[in-house]
């Protein structure tokens, strides 16, 4: 949903070269725990799995065992938006299977391009799968399909031209509305705020207001992706603040708040420290009036940091492989509310891994319930199947 996500995709598509394990680790890996395939009769939280001291064996054995009979029962009562990406097919399956636990799904399909003065075109429609959309709606008829609409390939001058012209905004809104109606979408998840690096915020407020009012007039939903209100690692104000939020809250249906990616390459650490996540919400909405429109972002992926300064995105399947290989002792950081583990390759390179666990998710879902927000998950196919018991 920003440059880091592009980095995530690139990292996933590039061939990854991994050093071999040390001889000791190789011997340990000779006997691996396999995942149980049977359906669980009770959700993960009732099976003693949501703990601060999980064993790697339990994660490997249980991660595919979700409670099938609990799929139609929602534990979290707020709004739940789940992102899916075309390059991760498992997310499509998750959206269908756990549809009753979601309130909206945002496929990462679409790009809004400016072709010239008062001329716009939405690309990516080839990814639209009507059969899948029908299946998601069958699983939960109330689920809204809100494709992400990324303002892509725009120059700074493109933004200036649109932000300074009511006619440009009118044409942009018309194009978005017509495509949504023609394709049967319920609205959009708009991603444009971060592209200007925090500049021209007053003008962006006007553009988003115009676009959301156009969509709302057509009985469509308008969600806005927003960066964290507290900059990661610095404590300084982010690119989207309380003033922006209060101006847009009356017209934007929901705000997808990116409360993750706190750490990154060269700066190893937690993905979403709990105190920081809380502060990002409170900075936007110290009072409760509009908090229900905030979708607290929850990452379903992790990062594998190396002592050389690199950081490899880590998805569920690879994390399970790694747990089998290194058989680590998971450590709990009480201050951040995250698990991590360490391992070392035979070339001497040390690694530290942060990946979501059931306890990680429980704390963030509980925080959302406490603050009265919804949640947004990036992205559905990257997590472990038993995660969804908590929803």
Curated annotation (Swiss-Prot):
Q: What is its main location?
A: secreted
One biological process term from GO is: carbohydrate metabolic process
Domain GH18 as annotated: residue spans: 78-391
What the entry lists under InterPro entries is as follows: Chitinase_II/V-like_cat, Chitinase_insertion_sf, Glyco_hydro18_cat, Glycoside_hydrolase_SF
Among PROSITE patterns, the record links this protein to: GH18_2
The UniProt annotation puts the region (Disordered) at: 27-46
Q: List where in the cell it is found.
A: Secreted; Lysosome
Quick one: signal sequence residues? 1-19
Annotated GO MF terms: chitin binding; oligosaccharide binding
Q: Which UniProt keywords apply?
A: Lysosome, Secreted, Signal
Q: Which domain of life is it from?
A: Eukaryota
Where is it found, in Gene Ontology cellular component terms? endomembrane system; extracellular region; lysosome
The family database entries (Pfam families) matched by this protein are listed as:
Glyco_hydro_18 (PF00704)
Q: Which family does it belong to?
A: Belongs to the glycosyl hydrolase 18 family.
The name under which this protein is listed is Chitinase domain-containing protein 1
**Lineage of producing organism:** Eukaryota, Metazoa, Chordata, Craniata, Vertebrata
Q: Which gene encodes it?
A: chid1
């Amino acid at each position: 949903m920003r440059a880091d996500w592009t980095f995530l995709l690139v990292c996933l598509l590039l061939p990854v070269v991994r050093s071999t394990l040390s001889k000791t680790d190789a011997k340990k890996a000779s006997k691996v725990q396999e995942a149980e395939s049977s359906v669980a009769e009770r959700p993960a939280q009732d099976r003693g799995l949501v703990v601060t001291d999980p064993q790697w064996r339990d994660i490997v054995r249980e991660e595919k065992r979700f409670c099938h009979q609990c799929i139609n029962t929602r534990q979290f009562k707020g709004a739940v938006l789940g992102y899916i990406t075309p390059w991760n097919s498992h997310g499509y399956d998750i959206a269908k299977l756990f549809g009753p636990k979601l309130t909206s799904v945002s496929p990462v399909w679409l790009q809004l391009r400016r072709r010239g003065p008062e001329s716009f075109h939405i690309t990516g429609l080839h990814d639209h799968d009507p059969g899948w959309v029908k299946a998601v709606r069958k699983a939960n008829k109330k689920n809204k399909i809100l494709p992400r609409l990324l303002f892509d390939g725009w120059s700074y001058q493109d933004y200036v031209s649109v932000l300074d012209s009511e006619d440009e905004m009118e044409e942009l809104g018309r194009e978005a509305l017509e495509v949504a109606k023609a394709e049967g979408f319920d609205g959009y998840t708009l991603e444009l705020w971060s592209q200007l690096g925090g500049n021209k915020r007053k003008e962006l407020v006007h553009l988003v207001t115009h676009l959301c009012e156009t969509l709302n007039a057509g009985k469509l939903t308008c969600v806005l992706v927003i960066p964290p209100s507290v900059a990661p690692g610095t404590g300084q104000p982010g690119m989207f603040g309380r003033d922006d939020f209060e101006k847009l809250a009356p017209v934007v249906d929901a705000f997808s708040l990116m409360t993750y990616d706190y750490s990154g390459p060269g700066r190893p650490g937690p993905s979403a420290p709990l105190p920081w996540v809380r502060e990002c919400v409170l900075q936007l909405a110290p009072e409760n009036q509009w908090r229900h429109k905030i979708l607290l972002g929850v990452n379903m992926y992790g990062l594998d940091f190396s002592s050389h300064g690199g950081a490899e995105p880590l998805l569920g399947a690879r994390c399970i492989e790694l747990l089998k290989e290194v058989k680590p002792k998971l450590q709990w950081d009480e201050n951040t509310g995250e698990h991590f583990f360490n391992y070392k390759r035979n070339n001497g390179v040390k690694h530290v891994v942060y990946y979501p666990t059931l306890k990680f998710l429980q704390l963030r879902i509980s925080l959302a319930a406490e603050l009265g927000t919804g949640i947004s998950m990036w992205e559905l196919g990257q997590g472990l199947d038993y995660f969804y018991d908590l929803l």
